[in-house]
Amino acid sequence: MNIVVYPGTFDPVTNGHYDLIERASRMFDKVVVAVAASPRKQPTLSLETRVALIEEVTADLDNVTVTGFSCLLTQLLAQQNARIILRGLRAVSDFEYELQLANMNRAQAPDVESLFLTPEVENSYISSTIVREIARLGGDVSKLVHPCVVDALSRHFAQDPSSPKTQ
């Protein structure tokens, strides 16, 4: 079976992420979306929420599974019997960082390959950071994320006392 793992924080999952997941689902027998716990990044949404949102967003894709993880990515690949890591590149600036990660992963597990995909043009400017900031300030993110993500962000920031919307 040809398996690819698409790791990320997905805080939140965006239309750009979905674009890559959907395209990968046509190239591979199985796509594992691996949601990193990433405590150092202090995610806005909990790991459980991020996993649930991706499950909902990708419900139409039969060969996609979603899992949370807090181990080394190469350990997760071994658990999933996968040898390929999918990463998205929006701009040249992403490449340098991604190349560094790819080389580190290969040093950890020499049989692991990294596959880089670029998003469709209409998704090339979308980032989770931008989506979070727009949502935190009360802006409309409905063209950037799935409706379930809009709802989750609205609920989160309605309860967040540091959000300008609640002040």
From Swiss-Prot:
CC cofactor: Mg(2+)
Coiled coil: none
Catalytic reaction(s) noted: (R)-4'-phosphopantetheine + ATP + H(+) = 3'-dephospho-CoA + diphosphate
Single Gene Ontology BP annotation: coenzyme A biosynthetic process
Molecular functions per Gene Ontology: ATP binding; pantetheine-phosphate adenylyltransferase activity
Binding residue positions for ATP: T9, F10, H17, G88, L89, R90, E98, N123, S124, Y125, I126, S127, S128, T129
Pfam families reported for this sequence: CTP_transf_like
Annotated positions for site Transition state stabilizer: H17
EC nos: 2.7.7.3
Chain's role: Reversibly transfers an adenylyl group from ATP to 4'-phosphopantetheine, yielding dephospho-CoA (dPCoA) and pyrophosphate.
Alphabetical list of NCBIfam families matching this protein: coaD_prev_kdtB (TIGR01510), cyt_tran_rel (TIGR00125)
Location (main, coarse): cytoplasm
One cellular-component annotation, GO: cytoplasm
Protein name: Phosphopantetheine adenylyltransferase
Assembly behavior: Homohexamer.
Enzyme class, broadest EC rank: transferase
Alphabetical UniProt keywords: ATP-binding, Coenzyme A biosynthesis, Cytoplasm, Magnesium, Nucleotide-binding, Nucleotidyltransferase, Transferase
InterPro entries named in the record: Cyt_trans-like, PPAT, Rossmann-like_a/b/a_fold
Organism: Chromohalobacter salexigens (strain ATCC BAA-138 / DSM 3043 / CIP 106854 / NCIMB 13768 / 1H11)
Pathway in which the depicted protein is active: Cofactor biosynthesis; coenzyme A biosynthesis; CoA from (R)-pantothenate: step 4/5
Subcellular location per the Swiss-Prot or TrEMBL entry: Cytoplasm
Binding site for substrate: T9, K41, L73, R87
Family: Belongs to the bacterial CoaD family.
